[in-house]
Amino acid sequence: MIQEIMADLSGFLTYARSFRRTGSFVLDACLHCRRCDGCRIWEKTVKHWDVSAISVILTEAGGKLTDLNGVHYYTGLPELVASNGVLHSEILNLLKTVRSTVSRKLIEGKRLESFYFFSLRFAFAIHTRYKIQLHLNPSGDRSWNINSQKASICKGCPSSAHFTETLEFHYGKHHQTYVTKPQQPNQRD
């Protein structure tokens, strides 16, 4: 599972200006798909009660909600991609390309692993791969967060989200467990 998440995340980080995750599929779809020209959300193991309403809302707004093969949403799909429709096919192609390069193992049944242990493994994998400083607050056992400052100003864009490009990844109810990349000092000429 870690390899899949790392492959997906690496693929999006190659092409994305920013990456945000609130921990709620419905909230992400409503907020992020209205803001961007090519916004995308992909989610693993979504329950049908989390997706049913957003399927209607997104479709009525002109967006798309499909599985990783481009099949329109129906109850029981394990992985979903939501977008405002502009770059939906490109997102699907990116995910297919990234996932074809990763050897994926099929596991029968469900693997029991505490979410806290999974969060620690994921944070450590990010720390190791991207050389990002790791911070862990033990009071938050159901969350991880990656922040990384990227390039700055997007002229002519009314959205304040583009003025400081931030890469964020959040999961869970509590955002005390996090990984941050130290900011580079400003160099003067």
Curated annotation (Swiss-Prot):
InterPro entries: Inositol_monophosphatase-like (IPR000760), Mn/Fe_SOD_N_sf (IPR036324). Signal peptide: none annotated. One of its GO terms (molecular function) is inositol monophosphate 1-phosphatase activity. Pfam families: Inositol_P. One of its GO terms (biological process) is inositol metabolic process. Belongs to the inositol monophosphatase superfamily. This is Uncharacterized 22 kDa protein in trpE 5'region. It comes from Leptospira biflexa.
